[in-house]
Structures are given as C-alpha cells and as structure tokens.
Amino acid sequence: AVEEFAANYGTLIITVDCGIANIAEIEKANELSIDVIVTDHHRPQETLPAAYTIIDPKIKDGDKYIYPFPDLAGCGVAYKLASAIRFALKSAYYGQPVCLLNTRPANGDAWIIETLKLRNLLIIDKLTETIVPGTAGINDTRLGAFFSNQLIFTWDAALQKRTLAKIFGSGIEFNMADLQPEIGAAMPLVAGKSLFRLKEISHAARYAQGAFGELDVFYNLFVSYVQKKEQLLQDEDDFDLQLAAVGTIADLMPLHNENRVIIQAGIEAINRKMHPGLADLVFKLGLAGRKLRSAEISWQICPVINSAGRMGRANVSAQLLLEKDPKERDRLAAEIIAMDNERKDLGARVWTIANPIATQNLEVYSGNLAFAWSDDIPRGATGITANRLSSHFKLPSLVVSFNDGIATGSLRSARGYDLQGILEQCADLFIDWGGHGYAAGFSMDRANWDAFLERLRTAAKTIEFSAPKSDAETIYIDAELPLSYLNPDIFKVIDTFQPYGKDNKELMFLSRGLKVIDIGFIGRLETRHVKLTLDAGRYKWAAVYWNAAEKVDKDFTLNDVVDAVFKIERNWFKGNEIPQICVHDLQRQ
C-alpha cells in the first residue's frame, strides 16, 4: 500500500487508530520520501516507529504517561488532530503567545499577581508572585521576563492597573488589553461581573478537583470567547465530534475523563443536528424521531457500522460518512444494513464451530483460556466470536482464523486480566500485534503455529485474575427504590448519570413488594423470554425478563408479590416511548 501511494505521488500519510506498531511500513514510507503522522492509542512497543510525528496518549516518559489521560480512544486522538488543524487554519491566535493576568488580595497587606502563558489556547506556563506593596520593584520579580514580548489580556484593566500601581508604584506602565467588555458583549451572562463573583457562580469551580481560582475562570472564559468569536465550533466540527463519540462507544473505551466528555458532547450534537451519513443510517434502522442516547448508539448503531468491516468491506461504512449525494447515501445505508444481517447469520454459524472447540480446549489451557481455531472461521468473525466466548466462559478468549498461510487472532479479556501478558510471551512469533489490555489482535505466519501453541499452553498457566469468576455473576445494586419512587420522574436520576458504558454501567435498582399482575411470553418459535406487568401502587410498569420462561410457575407466578432487581429503560413501540423495567433477578416474597 505504501508503494502504491508513492506511485500516485502521495507525500503524507496520517494513520488513524493504528501505526504505533508499524515500524517496517513507516520505514518504507521514509525511504519513499513520504511523511507519516501516526495517530493511535494502542500501547507502543519498546521501539517507536520513525514517523514524522507520533500522537499517542499511551507513550510514556519513563514510568509516567506524557498525556494526562492515556485511555483516550483512537478516534478521539484523530478528532483532536482534526480540531487542531481546523484551529490552525481559522484562528488568529494560532501560534501566538498570549498572557492572562489577574491580581487579587492575599493575607495582610500582600497582593497576589497570577498569570498564565498560552499558546494555541493551551496553558504552557504559569507564574504567581506574592508581594507586599513597596517592598519590591518589578525587576526584583520574575514578571518582567515572563511578560517579555507577550500580548497581555486582563479582566477589568482599570482595576488591574490601579492594583499594579499600588504594588510597584505609578512609574511602571503595563501594556494590557481589557477583555471584559468584549467577552461581556458576546456572553451577556458574565457582563459586568468580577472574576471573584463569576468564580462563586461557576459550575466548573463547584465541581473542580483541587483549587479553582479567578484566573481559572478567566482562562475558561477566554477559550470560550475565542471559540465563539472565531466560529471554531460549527457544523463541520460538530459532525467530527459525533463520529468521535460513536467511535469511542464502539471501541468500548472506559467512560470517564475525556472519553465521557467526548461522548456526552457528541450525543448532544447528534440530537441537535445529525451527521448526514449517520442520519440516513438511523432512519433506515427505525430510530429517527427519537432522542438518541448511549444505549441506542451502543446496541443498535455501532454494530451496524462495524458490520462492513467484519465482512471485509469497511470502505462502505467510510463512504457512507463521506458521501455528499443523498441518493448514494441511502443506497450505502441499505447495503450496510444488509451486511449486518449477513454478519449476524455468519456469527451464529461460527459460534457453532468455535464453542465446541473452545470447550474441548479448556483443560489443555489450564481452565484459564477459551481458545478456538479453525480453517472454517472467517477472519471477519474472530473478534465478535472471541467477545462471545469471553462472555460465555467468563475467561480471556482467543479465536484464530487462517488465510493464505497467515494466522490472524483476536483476543478479548475477562475478569480483569491484561492481555499483554499473553502477547508479550509470544511477540517474537508474530508478524504484527497490538491492542489494549482487554482487546487485542495479531497476525502470524502459520509456520509458527506449533511453537505458538506450545507457548500459549505455558502462558495460560500463568494467567491470574484480578476478579474471581463468581464476581462475573454478582449483581451490584446502586440503590433500593421504595415503590413510590417508581414513577416517570426516575428518568431524571437515570439521565443525570448518562452516558453509560464501560466503567459506568447502567444504574441497577432493587424494589420490594411489587405485585405480578400479568404474565406473557415473547417469541414465536421459542418462548424463552417473559413479559410482565408489575404493580408499584400508583404506577403499573411493563417489564421484560430475558431467558426466564422456565421460571414461571416455579420461582414466581401470577399475583405473587416479589422483590426485583432491575434496570429502567425506554422502549419504543409504534413511535411511542414506553418506560420499561428490565428484570435481572426476581424472588417471591
């Protein structure tokens, strides 16, 4: 691919969610005078590729990550690069050093002078001086050098100048620009208020971890003002943000820190004005007209988009998101949904192959690894099958397919095991490998297969879990709800903790004394699932209880009073939103 790109006079390659392990390919690009910018989030190996630039939050300086949030998704890294390029093209502040200055009283007669130095809206330096008026000149402080050749912005310049004159004397002239009038005009809610007052009413100050002062308020206002004034956050950025949110959910990244912010802001953008490609897919999936949340994106949208890649035609999903012509987008959306149906059929067929093999191999791999391989398993089904094996056996799982003499494997973790332990013990056998502690993959020459099996048997003996197997079946309850709390207002609580996903599971409740007033069954060919109506007093709740048909008339029956553990969700039927309980466990009182 690199040679083909060079033959077409390409000069720059930007990777997305890959590249950190592609040392040979990037070396070839260098030989062909092609620059490579790597954007990735996978763990780097000991040797980094010789790329023009590497952007990866998992790169360390010694034992410490350089970037403050190493779990950023690959699509999040790419989104940040796209946003930075857009800022460079549109902003007058690109590359320009700026200082923000504020003064405030300290204890006694002293004053605090605090300042931030910014470049590209990011803090690159900060300085704080505490001075008693008349005890020092400006040349006795570090301020002169800090302010040298800098554009200085302040809030209420007249007040700041009076304070500085009081500290250093009236002979010192500070050349500063007052942003209070401009920001106040752009954001009427802050007009006429001091930084001290704004700090008192700031949500950021209220929920900040650690100190949050007046200068922090000024910095946040400045960034928001520049974004608004220069119209940096328009449809184009919103559409990119939506894709970053969907990608972060699809990649099963932990929902905290920046991932949570990206998903939350991205979902808000989706519900405000959806990306055209997503909108066409959402329409064909029957989701149009409803407010989308993380659950719909995770369960109904992400698998469909991913299906094209599973079926070896990832370019179709990419084209849907790039296509400008509405008719062509409609055709592509229909094609992707057809591939998703094909993927489901393939997954069911491959499961009948992989499950017996993994079961047979359990003892061989010390009961610590679910491992299946077959010439009949297509490469596109390895990931989804490994995921299903992991869930089924509550063990780390590996599924391998073979094609043209190459073994391709997908691994999924369970019970807190870090997959790097297996991969590193076999690394010299691989053509390439990479991933996370909980999802990874590799490719390998089939000639190394016997050596790999031997290594894997040894590695499996060393697997240790951070969570016992029983924990996988334990239900953790977030709150016990009195029956009076089971009303539609409960969604205000549930939505407060959105978005849900990895490391932020949906809220699980316990309620006692519910009466079963109706029982039905779901399914035409099989009646495995149960639908219930539960009486909570003022409100009657529709409920589903999956795989519970055999429990009817055994563990509970009509008119029983029960205690239930459940989630509360929204179900859509014929265009109407219906609150619904999803039962996880139920016991007769």
Regions found by a protein language model. Give the residues of each.
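Short gly/pro/ser/thr-enriched loop/turn and capping motifs at secondary-structure boundaries
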Residues: N22, R43-T47, D61-D63, Q180-A185, ...
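A structured phosphate/pyrophosphate-recognition subdomain
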Residues: A50-L122, Q180-T359
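Conserved DEDDh/DEDDy metal-dependent 3′-5′ exonuclease domain
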Residues: T128-P188, L215, L221-F222
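Short glycine-cluster motifs
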Residues: N175, I183, S202, L398-S413
